[in-house]
């Protein structure tokens, strides 16, 4: 049985001693973004970012013992979520560069590896976009809109993933009596993979439930391959699951568009149509059936801009049809996508509002083969080994910049940002 978490009800709990905010206050790096309209052009927003709560130190109140261990919550400190909230405090982060994150104006650099005390560490940061108030996540509503950003993937070798995507998290990060920190400290993460994490909406997950929500992968990529993929789920908001039901709540594989996997093997890469040795712009459009911001999502369209030239998405053949975008006919044969609501369900989430996540990571278990090896990309079966990446590419990183969204046709080509 799928269980929907009643997030708002948590605010009605008695005012027990909550997981407290520690003495080190959070300092959010500023990251300028832009909102674009047909009438006013692209206008600057004074937004910022926050690292996922998993990067924050959560420890025993009055001591230095972590509230989590390598296997999850410390049962002595966290036998239940109420006791855990009384026993634990979360500390802020004041220097994001120590976690591989640097911002400057409207650009953000994410590093996989950093040097600390002559040792290499892999913080593998994941950050979320905060609204201008710095307390809540920025909720993007993108039906009949477009989302655009510039990216430099030249330092992302095989096996790396510089990802930018949306998930249907709560705007407050699940702020409640037991989680006063909320979005300002990066709580509330969820996605369509339904992982079991130590915390759910900033509260101790002593029941070891899985947590699911709708996910729209705008960009999963390195210098050799890329994909964009909607992942619908069969309900709205945050979903709790247990056991086998965690495999049926969301479309974990999704309906993806990877040019290489679909036969366009000279389209994306070094000196190809989209040249990954140089920065470029990625545009994703969410077209609705009635061309309104409340209509049913019918198509997810992709294009690129590089060196002043607009580049249409790769044109490929699928089941005898010529396609270059994600539509219901394209997704009809892709697993459980339609059964879980397909583009309609994904569009409903985009209409309600989703949170922007950006990350860099590699894959010790599968070497990121699903993205860039075999039928999915040109990388060998061993190039994605994280130990090889660390030795050969210690400066691996991705830069996202000039993030903007708004009316169709307003975010790219000759539009000025101001």
Curated annotation (Swiss-Prot):
Residues carrying a glycan: 46, 118, 136, 234, 291
Top-level EC class: hydrolase
Entry annotated with the keyword Zinc: no
Catalytic reactions on record: Endohydrolysis of (1->4)-beta-D-glucosidic linkages in cellulose, lichenin and cereal beta-D-glucans
Its job: Has endoglucanase activity on substrates containing beta-1,4 glycosidic bonds, like in carboxymethylcellulose (CMC), hydroxyethylcellulose (HEC) and beta-glucan. Involved in the degradation of complex natural cellulosic substrates.
PANTHER family hit by this protein: 1,4-BETA-D-GLUCAN CELLOBIOHYDROLASE B, ENDO-BETA-1,4-GLUCANASE CELB
Protein name: Probable endo-beta-1,4-glucanase celB
Native organism: Aspergillus clavatus (strain ATCC 1007 / CBS 513.65 / DSM 816 / NCTC 3887 / NRRL 1 / QM 1276 / 107)
Gene: celB
């Amino acid at each position: 049985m799928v269980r929907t978490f009643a997030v708002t009800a948590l605010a009605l709990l008695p005012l027990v001693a909550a997981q407290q905010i520690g003495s080190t206050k959070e300092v959010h790096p500023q990251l300028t973004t832009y909102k674009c309209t047909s009438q006013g052009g692209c206008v600057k927003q004074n937004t910022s970012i926050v690292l996922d709560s998993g990067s924050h130190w959560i420890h025993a109140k009055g001591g230095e013992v972590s509230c989590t261990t390598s296997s999850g919550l410390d049962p002595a400190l966290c036998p239940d979520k109420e006791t855990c909230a009384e026993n634990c405090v979360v500390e802020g982060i004041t220097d994001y560069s120590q976690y591989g994150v640097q911002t400057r104006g409207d650009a953000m650099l994410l590093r996989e590896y950093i040097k600390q005390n002559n040792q290499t560490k892999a913080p593998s940061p994941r950050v979320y976009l905060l609204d201008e108030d710095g307390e809540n996540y920025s909720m993007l509503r993108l039906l009949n809109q477009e989302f655009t950003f510039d990216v430099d993937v030249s330092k992302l070798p095989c096996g790396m993933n510089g990802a930018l995507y949306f998930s249907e998290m709560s705007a407050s990060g699940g702020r409640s009596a037991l989680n006063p920190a909320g979005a300002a400290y990066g709580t509330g993460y969820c996605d369509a993979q339904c992982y079991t994490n130590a915390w759910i909406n900033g509260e101790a997950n002593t029941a070891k439930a899985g947590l699911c929500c709708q996910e729209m992968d705008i960009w999963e990529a390195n210098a050799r391959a890329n994909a964009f993929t909607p992942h619908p789920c069969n309900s709205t908001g945050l979903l709790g699951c247990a056991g086998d039901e965690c495999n049926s709540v969301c479309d974990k594989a999704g309906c993806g568009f990877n040019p290489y996997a679909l036969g366009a093997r000279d389209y994306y890469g070094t000196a190809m149509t989209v040249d990954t040795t140089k920065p470029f712009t990625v545009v994703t459009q969410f077209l609705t059936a009635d061309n309104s911001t409340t209509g049913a999502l019918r198509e997810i369209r992709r294009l690129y801009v590089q060196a002043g030239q607009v580049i249409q998405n790769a044109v490929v053949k699928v089941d005898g049809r010529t396609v270059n975008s994600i539509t219901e006919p394209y997704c009809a044969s892709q697993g459980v996508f339609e059964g879980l609501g397909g583009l309609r369900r994904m569009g409903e989430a985009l209409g309600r509002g989703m949170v922007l996540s950006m990350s860099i990571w590699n894959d010790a278990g599968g070497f990121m083969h699903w993205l860039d090896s075999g039928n999915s990309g040109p990388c060998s079966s061993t190039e994605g080994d994280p130990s090889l990446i660390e030795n050969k590419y210690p400066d691996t990183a991705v830069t996202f910049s000039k993030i903007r969204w708004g009316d169709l046709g307003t975010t790219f080509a000759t539009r000025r940002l101001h």
